[in-house]
């Protein structure tokens, strides 16, 4: 989620910037290759079978582990920053395979096995989709606006200090 505000590839290339790519690849491979889902993008979101909200995701990416389950479009939108071709293909697949796109944009979730859609909009998830699309279509405009702030300019370079990807 921070990628909608911070250009993590630029400011944290040896940590969060690379981790963003790894996370997107694992999301995709787990859903498509392990679970054999036709679409990917698991994260906490609304549940299709009730009015609730639950944690879904990729077990190895969660602190406590997640249960497999529904797919939510906001994950794919966030991946536009690091794997744009794959993200666009997944958004198209979601629209082609499921009734996931409504009058105000993407509904919150779909069960890729049953095809059941949570026909509701969650403002948090819609916000992530909106900002991710604004960045993708507007030359990273949200990230650039944030980075132009004098306070941000003082702290963003500190992200480069952390290196948790070296041997």
Map each language-model feature to its residues.
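Ser/Thr/Asn(+Pro)-rich, low-complexity disordered segments
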Residues: 1-167
